[in-house]
């Protein structure tokens, strides 16, 4: 019987794609349990380039994201943690911003690229503008993130303005 080899995920940083297309993968899903068991207000992931930081962040997003595809975790080690999966999987809005694609010769160009990244992520949460939980100030602040010509001063506060409306979750 001939054994079919899985493809190597060279350059793939999207956990859902990696799982859906059956790439070879070293199961690091217990990182999720480790983070929940050793909860900290801030977690800093330091590793050299090409060590899977973005893929791990994508895995965290896939796990926690509202209405995420739970099939991504079928057969993984974390799926055996039934209680943990019931409590946390697919229950939260997840803000996912990677700055690794910002490569510019000038500060202005880098700032423009950062604006586009934040703008794209804010669009994913546009539905929050319909929430009755948000004040008009919060809605106005959030709307400023949706403008393609966002000001640099708005960019500086963008993580606050994206995350504040998700707080009730």
What is the predicted role of each segment?
Residues 2, 109-159:
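Accessory N-terminal region flanking or inserted into the helicase ATPase core
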Residues 160-169:
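Single conserved hydrophobic/aromatic residue that forms the stacking wall/gate
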């Amino acid at each position: 019987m001939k054994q079919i080899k899985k493809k190597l995920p060279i350059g793939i940083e999207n956990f859902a794609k990696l799982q859906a297309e059956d790439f070879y993968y070293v199961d690091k899903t217990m990182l999720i349990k480790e983070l929940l068991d050793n909860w900290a207000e801030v977690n800093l992931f330091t590793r050299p380039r090409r060590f899977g930081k973005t893929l791990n962040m994508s895995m965290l997003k896939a796990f926690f994201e509202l209405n995420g595809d739970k099939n991504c975790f079928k057969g993984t080690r974390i799926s055996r943690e039934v209680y943990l999966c019931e409590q946390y999987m697919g229950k939260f809005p997840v803000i996912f911003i990677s700055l690794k694609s910002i490569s510019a010769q000038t500060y202005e160009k880098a700032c423009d690229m950062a604006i586009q990244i934040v703008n794209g992520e804010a669009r994913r949460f546009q539905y929050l503008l319909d929430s009755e939980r948000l004040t008009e100030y919060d809605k106005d602040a959030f709307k400023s993130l949706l403008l393609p010509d966002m000001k640099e001063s708005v960019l500086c506060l963008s993580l606050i303005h994206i995350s504040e409306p998700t707080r009730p979750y």
